[in-house]
A protein has these predicted regions:
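Structural signature of Gram-negative outer-membrane beta-barrels, strongest in the C-terminal barrel
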Residues: 368-372, 378-380, 388-542
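Transmembrane beta-barrel wall of Gram-negative outer-membrane proteins
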Residues: 201-227, 237-276, 304-321, 367-368, ...
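Short acidic/polar hinge/loop motifs at secondary-structure boundaries
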Residues: 133-160
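Outer-membrane beta-barrel translocator/receptor signature
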Residues: 137-139, 152-154, 165-235, 242-249, ...
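Gram-negative outer-membrane beta-barrel transporters
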Residues: 538-541, 559-652
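C-terminal beta-signal and adjacent terminal beta-strands/loops
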Residues: 485, 543-544, 548, 650-655, ...
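Outer membrane beta-barrel strand-and-loop segments of large Gram-negative receptors
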Residues: 347-362, 507-513, 519, 528, ...
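Flexible loop and strand-edge segments within Gram-negative outer membrane beta-barrel domains
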Residues: 228-230, 240-246, 260-321, 325, ...
Length: 739
């Protein structure tokens, strides 16, 4: 496989990176020449300033819940992250890059692994869409991140709230849609090189991209790499096990023609992150580090994970009159391995192999008297196999499908939209009888099996209805009511084993029921040249909310299995309230003062005080920044800006306290600074330069959603767990090449 990948990479680089980023993702499909390409503009307009005005963002065409529509016409709450914003934001992974958005958080395991959280809900409640299909890895796991190369992402749509209507089970919290760069116009070829460095963990990354369109034949080739040693903070020093290495390759080949397009995308992603165990010396309180270990080594410290993700997507689109028929077929292979034995470094403990086939067929009708209709079917088939010497979940087969129909109507300044969907999922879990038990117990009793075979089927009806109304030219109102559905995942139903990455013994529950939710959203936004403001409020009711609870014995002491704290999945009803507020003021030209505030209140109903709040509820967060854009002559420098930011995370007293599953988290404030500019030569952009300093005061802090917060106690200081990254400076250079 390595030989094949190297050969593909060599051929691609010889012919070989992305088109320069546009600030707003506008993919146009020109029926005259069949091209899907960026709007043809000169370089200065193509590379927009950092922040778009509210007026411009309202004109962005997004996927939404009922098909493509302008952002201001979508009743569902949607945030849009432009290419320019992604380009200037220092990060260690793609979720880290968007976690600054209001209502978006991340569950982290060190600096390299992040899981998305939307309005307090994460894991299998957030669907990730990339290359047009839902990304399927091992997203049920605490320390399993998203297998997407950040450099390959052109823009991001963040759908907040139930989106099961279009995306089926799991889209209860929302959807993250990662868009690749649109194909270029005929005759256009561009290359791109970017590189960056971060001082705290020595993170070095680079990306090469080459894209073009010759006579309708389109291609887009990218190769990226990244490596980082252990990060450090004021309390822990260098954190052993937090290093990582990453490689990614993608290749798009296709044909744009008058009546549509056919594109084949091939992706390969390889991540090798360390595992932070947080064990400490009882006398000194310092983190234990193997003898001879170099904290600045880019090697693989034991224990570590290894993730391989392969993906192939065939994307076809045809115009049928003024309607559009779209068919996507995808295959993904995800393999996750955990290596933990010094004596046998090549022998892995946990080894999951997941195969997924995705399919999506839908039709969008032509507009008729302001009405638009769409209908379709999508779903997936999965097979999971255990290949390691340790087991956490059983092997299983899964098949699901969902049929849906949507409708939208524009009546003057009023836009109405809605739809309905039916989902069905069947899961077949296989039995596993461990060899040791089989040799010592021939009675056939249940305790000789690690996993019992079982079959479960789940079904649900979901939908949404909403409106967007232009009260005034600068003032909009949105209302939306949506129903969500999520079937329990394999881990929640039948896990039984020690998970090295989480330091837990996890137990499933085969009697769990599907989650169902109702969410109501209210959104008000105002945009003018001087001030832009938005208020988004939501109320969410979830039945049969599934979570893991730490087990305790009759003396209220933790239950240990194999010397590891035991957790079991259970369920209850939940109510989540909250919202986001933002205001951006332009008191004088070129000066921007922005403030955003996010709040989530997650409560379990009919529970005692120690179980009142849901686990992993993000703390209230206030982000304030002042940005100044300098006036440049445009000959040498352009889009020069400086931004000072205060990131204030308030104290989180709402935590799941039962059996000390969670604890309160103190407040903290981070001071950050960013600067950037385009450097030009002979009127063309030579390169873009970005500088940043984050956590400038070197504050020692723990985010409430950091899993390292619950590792061993420092017996000397009394502090528990490992702290987040300290002061970090970064530099990034992006060099576009027009051919």
């Amino acid at each position: 496989m390595r030989t094949i990948l190297k050969a593909i990479l060599l051929m691609s680089l010889c012919s070989s990176a992305t088109a320069p980023a546009m600030a707003i993702n506008r993919a146009n499909h020109d029926k005259k020449d069949g091209n899907i390409h960026e709007e043809e503009t000169n370089d200065s307009t193509r590379h927009q300033p950092l922040t778009e005005s509210g007026v411009k963002l309202n004109e962005v065409v997004v996927t939404g819940l009922t098909g493509s529509q302008k952002l201001k016409q979508s009743p569902a709450p949607i945030s849009f992250v432009s290419a320019r914003q992604l380009e200037m934001q220092p990060s260690t992974n793609i979720i880290d890059a968007i976690a600054h958005q209001p209502g978006v958080s991340q569950i982290t395991t060190g600096s390299g692994i992040s899981k998305p959280v939307i309005r307090g809900l994460g894991y299998n409640r957030v669907v990730v869409v990339n290359d047009g299909i839902r990304q399927e890895g091992q997203q049920w796991g605490d320390e399993h991140g998203i297998e997407i190369d950040p450099a390959s992402v052109h823009s991001v749509e963040i759908l907040k709230g139930p989106a099961s209507l279009m995306y089926g089970s799991d889209a209860m919290a929302g959807v993250l849609i990662f868009h690749s760069a649109p194909t270029l116009a005929k005759g256009d070829m561009r290359a791109n090189f970017s590189t960056g460095y971060q001082t705290n963990n020595g993170l070095f990354d680079y990306s090469l991209n080459f894209a073009g369109n010759q006579g309708g034949f389109v291609w887009n080739t990218r190769y990226s790499g990244k490596m980082a040693h252990a990060y450090k903070n004021k309390y822990d020093g260098y954190v052993f096990g937090s290093s990582l290495r990453e490689q990614a390759f993608s290749q798009l080949l296709g044909w744009n023609y008058r009546q549509g397009h056919s594109h084949l995308t091939l992706d390969y992603y390889h991540l090798t992150p360390g595992i932070v165990e947080g064990e400490r010396d009882e006398k000194t309180g310092e983190l234990e580090i193997p003898e001879g270990y170099d904290a600045k080594s880019y090697g693989k410290p034991m224990p570590y994970q290894q993730i391989h993700h392969y993906k192939a997507v065939l994307d076809n689109s045809w115009f049928l009159g003024d309607g559009n028929l779209k068919f996507l077929l995808g295959y993904q292979q995800n393999r996750r391995q955990e290596f933990e034995e010094e004596e046998n470094p090549k022998e892995c403990g946990l080894d999951f192999m997941l195969h997924t086939m995705n399919y999506d067929l839908h039709y969008l009708s032509p507009e008729m008297n302001g009405w638009k209709f769409s209908t379709g079917i999508n779903g997936m088939w999965q097979q999971s196999v255990n290949k390691g010497s340790e087991f956490l979940i059983p092997a299983y087969h899964l098949f699901d499908y969902g049929v849906f129909a949507t409708v939208s109507k524009e009546i003057g300044k009023l836009n109405l939209s809605g739809g309905i969907r039916y989902d069905h999922r069947h899961l077949h879990s296989e039995a596993l009888r461990e060899e040791d038990d089989a040799e010592s117990n021939d009675s056939g009793l249940n305790d000789s099996f690690r996993f019992q075979a079982f079959k479960r089927s789940f079904e649900g009806v979901t939908g949404s209805i909403g409106l967007a109304y232009e009260i005034l030219p600068d003032f909009n109102l949105k209302l939306n009511l949506a129903r969500g559905f999520r079937a329990p995942n394999i881990s929640e139903l039948s896990s039984n084993g020690v998970h090295e990455g989480t330091q837990r013994y996890e137990l499933g529950n085969t009697s769990l029921k599907p989650e169902n939710s109702w969410q109501f959203d209210l959104d008000l936004d105002y945009s003018s040249p001087i001030i832009s403001a938005e208020l988004s409020l939501f109320a969410n009711r979830i039945n049969h909310y599934i979570y893991s609870e730490k087990l305790a014995d009759e003396n209220n002491q933790p239950v240990l299995i194999d010397d590891t704290p035991a957790y079991q999945f259970t369920s209850g009803d939940a109510r989540i309230l909250g919202g986001e507020a933002s205001i951006d003021i332009h008191p004088v030209e070129h000066l921007h003062i922005g403030n955003t505030f996010s709040y989530v209140n997650s409560v379990q109903l009919h529970q005692p005080s120690e179980s009142k709040y849901l686990p992993f509820t993000p703390a209230p967060r206030w982000v304030s920044d002042v940005r100044y854009e300098f006036v440049c002559d445009g000959k040498t420098f352009d889009h020069l800006f400086v931004k000072l930011q205060m990131d204030c995370n308030l104290r989180q007293n709402h935590y799941f306290a039962a059996n000390e599953t969670e604890t309160a988290t103190p407040s903290y404030t981070l001071l950050n600074m960013y600067a950037g500019t385009d450097v030009k030569l002979h009127g063309k952009r030579l390169l873009s330069l970005y500088l940043s300093g984050e956590n400038l005061t070197n504050r020692a802090y723990q985010n409430h959603l950091s899993r390292l917060k619950y590792l061993d106690v420092n017996q000397v200081t009394g502090r528990r767990g490992v702290y987040n990254m300290g002061r970090n400076f970064s530099i990034k250079i992006v060099v576009p090449i027009e051919l």
